């Protein structure tokens, strides 16, 4: 999970649109924070989650469109590894699939597409541009702001569903 989380975020999977990876990471971390508080698992690490989220907020504030800084692999790898560590410390590793669903889908579909093509010679995703945010920008006509906002809404809805499932 640690490697998968890091790989889905890095290497231009979700860091190609200004603010997308940072916004989705903040939503994911806040979901983990809430779930940690509900499950009462790891109170001490919650401060680290909040600190990381605040640092990302500062980055997003400074780097609002048009971006001034390129996050690069160093930042996106750090976000992926931190999400993986936070989820593992929560002792509910399968929650990762819900709280980071958009990051997984955005980065993971490219891995699925390449794997299907290379190993099984299946061209089922031939007309899909990966990562997904590039597909909706180029074929759907979405602007960068629309991509960030709509992907964030999708992740918030999925995260709220995960929180609700834990509460019942």
Which stretches of residues belong to each language-model region?
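Short glycine- and acidic-residue-rich catalytic loops of nucleotidyl-transferase/cyclase enzymes
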Residues: 1-4
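Alpha-helical transmembrane segments
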Residues: 6, 10-13, 17-168
């Amino acid at each position: 999970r640690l490697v998968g989380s890091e790989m889905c975020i890095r290497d231009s999977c979700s860091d190609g649109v200004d603010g997308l990876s940072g916004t989705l990471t903040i939503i994911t971390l806040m979901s983990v924070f809430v779930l940690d508080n509900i499950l009462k698992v790891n109170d001490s690490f919650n401060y680290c989650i909040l600190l990381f989220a605040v640092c990302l907020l500062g980055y997003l504030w400074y780097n609002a469109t048009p971006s001034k800084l390129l996050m690069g692999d160093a930042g996106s790898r750090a976000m992926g590894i931190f999400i993986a560590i936070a989820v593992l410390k929560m002792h509910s590793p399968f929650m990762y699939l819900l709280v980071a669903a958009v990051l997984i889908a955005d980065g993971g579909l490219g891995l699925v597409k390449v794997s299907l093509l290379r190993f099984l010679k299946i061209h089922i995703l031939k007309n899909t541009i990966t990562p997904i945010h590039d597909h909706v920008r180029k074929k759907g006509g979405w602007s960068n702001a629309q991509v960030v906002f709509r992907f964030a809404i999708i992740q918030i809805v999925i995260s709220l569903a995960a929180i609700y499932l834990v509460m019942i």
